Amino acid sequence: MSKPAEKPQGERPTGGKFLGYDHLHFWVGNAKQAAGWYTSRFGFEFFAYKGLETGSRDVATHVVKNKEGVMFAFSSPYHNDNESQKEMNAHQALHGDGVKDVAFAVEDCVAIYNKAISRGAKSVQAP
């Protein structure tokens, strides 16, 4: 097991203060059931939905939100043999239910992005 760094690594960015978490996106076997668990047990409220009724033929996503504004999005594929859901199905088979990505709320997204790129990060999508 590795030890956490005792000192900050590198200089702190001058812009782009971390404000909190915006959302976590979970890939799960049953999005509706997972969202229901968080609303019935932890005080989250239903916030948004994407699925068959909204025109999505591949994935269902249920979004819940807590009182602090943090959102959890739960997504599950409708089919396990669809090419468009290949990554999601492979991830589910290997790991089971879990967090796929985390989004932070920040003061200046562009400053943080530029600093990360200057330190060698690879861009997935520019802000």
Name every feature range the model reports, one short phrase each.
Residues G51-E53, D81-H91:
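Membrane-interface interhelical loops and short amphipathic "cap" helices
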Residues G16-M71, S118, A126-P127:
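Core segments of cupin and vicinal oxygen chelate
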Residues S2-Q9, H62-Q85:
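Conserved oxyanion/phosphate-binding beta-strand-loop segments in alpha/beta enzyme cores
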Residues P8-E11, F46-A48, K86-M88:
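Short secondary-structure boundary micro-motifs
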Residues Y38, N89-P127:
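Hydrophobic or amphipathic alpha-helical targeting/insertion segments
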Residues M1-K32, D97-V106:
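N-terminal beta-strand motif that seeds the catalytic metal site of vicinal oxygen chelate
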Residues S2-Q9, A31-A34, A111-N114, K122, ...:
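Amphipathic repeat-derived elements
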